[in-house]
């Protein structure tokens, strides 16, 4: 027998209290990749201390970056690129690490990156990344599970994406930031993409149109260093709001960007909950009798796909019928079977999930990706009885100090070891 860590949750306690939102992981990762573009020192203030960030730093160190933590502040410098190969053992752990491809191509003239890994839900191709780099003038090919690219001049051109793509947009921005120039059509408008653009502007690139479908970027021959503060994590903020809603609690979030959460806040308001919103804070008070609603996850400013599983868990506690559709990842429903183990009534047909809300009960469940894990935590907090959630690894990739922060809000949760049968040789 071996042991694994599980999150033990005794449900039924409304969450109450105040919470300061941590910086956004999905903004930090491409900004970390962008640090490869300059030999000058970079300081990032308030960086999330998550497993995904540590994996990205391991990859950057392999490529030539020197870094040091000072509390939650991160100091980085890449005097030279020591390797242009991003190996599978690092890239395979996290899809976002694929973004170093464009930065390597810009700084070193070539980049070789293994097929990305990360959360296993749906089909998430990299064809738009390849299309962007080829449109900008790079030679791109794939061999034995590794993507290769090289250039003979600074990359420039016009990229027309087939659809808005966060990763593809970020990849193109990094590829041209050092001496190149590009117009990106159907660019992603997510806050994390905008944050990367602001960071590149700090380093010396000229960026226009951020937050719109057409972005123009003109790189500088040499980028400088600087100090930057990453935006708050809208997905973390949304997860805690939905947890408070599911447990019929009350929550004040500080250090948040309410304008990044318009789609969720509108749904919560229409569900009957009370909300007060300031420039950088949200006060939430749950109604005891919330109404069901329809969720359709789509590109920003629509409802975030990363909050779709967590919203599903909340709706499973709301009497009446709700429906959930994900236009970004239509098969992102790895959480459905596990929620059903807790008594949730869920029916998936033609990629439309129908949710019939009811009181949930505790169960042994397993997180299969980061946000499915968040969904199971929300469900367990609201359920009657105790739950054990396996897959703590995924939770630690997406939620910093999750156990401690939930405890501070009154939740009865803790990590503990659970026996696991080992496979025979």
Swiss-Prot record:
InterPro entries: Enolpyruvate_Tfrase_dom, Enolpyruvate_Tfrase_sf, MurA_subfamily, RNA3'P_cycl/enolpyr_Trfase_a/b, UDP_GlcNAc_COvinyl_MurA. It comes from Thermus thermophilus (strain ATCC BAA-163 / DSM 7039 / HB27). Pfam families: EPSP_synthase. GO terms for cellular component: cytoplasm. The keyword Secreted does not apply. It comes from the Bacteria. UDP-N-acetyl-alpha-D-glucosamine binds at residues 95, 124-128, 306, 328. Pathway: Cell wall biogenesis; peptidoglycan biosynthesis. PANTHER family: UDP-N-ACETYLGLUCOSAMINE 1-CARBOXYVINYLTRANSFERASE. The gene is murA. Its main location: cytoplasm. The active site is at residue 119. It is found in: Cytoplasm. Belongs to the EPSP synthase family. MurA subfamily. Its EC number is 2.5.1.7. GO terms for biological process: cell division; cell wall organization; peptidoglycan biosynthetic process; regulation of cell shape; UDP-N-acetylgalactosamine biosynthetic process. This is UDP-N-acetylglucosamine 1-carboxyvinyltransferase.
């Amino acid at each position: 027998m071996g042991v694994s860590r599980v999150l033990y949750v005794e449900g039924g306690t409304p969450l109450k209290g105040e919470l300061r939102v941590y910086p956004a992981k999905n903004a930090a990762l491409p900004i970390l990749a962008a640090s490869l573009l300059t030999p000058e020192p970079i300081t990032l203030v308030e960086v999330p201390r998550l497993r995904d960030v540590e994996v990205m730093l391991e990859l950057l160190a392999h490529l030539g970056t020197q870094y040091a933590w000072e509390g939650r502040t991160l100091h980085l410098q890449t005097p030279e690129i020591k390797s242009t190969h991003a190996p599978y053992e690092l890239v395979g752990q996290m899809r976002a690490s694929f973004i170093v491809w464009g930065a390597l191509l810009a700084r070193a003239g070539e980049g070789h990156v293994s097929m990305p890994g990360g959360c296993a839900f749906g089909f998430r191709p990299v064809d738009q990344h390849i299309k962007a780099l080829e449109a900008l003038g790079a030679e791109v090919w794939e061999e034995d599970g590794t993507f290769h690219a090289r250039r003979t001049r600074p990359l420039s051109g016009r990229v027309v994406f087939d659809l808005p793509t966060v990763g593809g947009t970020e990849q193109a921005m990094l590829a041209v930031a050092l001496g190149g120039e590009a117009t990106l059509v159907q660019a992603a408008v997510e806050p994390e993409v905008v944050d990367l653009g602001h960071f590149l502007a700090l380093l010396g690139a000229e960026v226009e149109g951020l937050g719109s479908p057409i972005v123009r970027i003109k790189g500088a021959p040499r980028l400088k260093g600087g100090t930057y503060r990453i935006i708050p994590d809208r997905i973390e903020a949304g997860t805690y709001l939905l947890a408070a809603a599911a447990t019929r609690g009350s929550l004040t979030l500080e250090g948040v960007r309410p304008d990044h959460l318009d789609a969720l806040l509108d749904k919560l308001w229409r569900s009957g909950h009370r909300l007060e919103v300031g420039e950088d804070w949200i006060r939430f008070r749950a109604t005891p009798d919330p109404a069901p609603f329809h969720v359709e996850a789509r590109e920003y400013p629509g409802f975030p796909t990363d909050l779709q599983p967590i919203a599903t868990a909340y709706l499973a506690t709301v009497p009446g019928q709700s429906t959930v559709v994900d236009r970004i990842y239509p098969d992102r429903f790895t959480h459905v079977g596990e929620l059903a183990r807790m008594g949730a009534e869920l029916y998936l047909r033609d990629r439309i999930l129908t949710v019939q809300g009811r009181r949930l009960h505790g169960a042994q469940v397993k997180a299969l990706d980061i946000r499915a894990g968040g969904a199971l935590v929300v469900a367990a907090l609201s359920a009657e009885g105790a739950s054990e959630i396996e897959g703590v690894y995924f939770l630690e990739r997406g939620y910093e100090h999750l156990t401690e922060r939930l405890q501070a809000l009154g939740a009865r949760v803790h990590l503990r070891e659970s026996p696991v049968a080992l496979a025979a040789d």
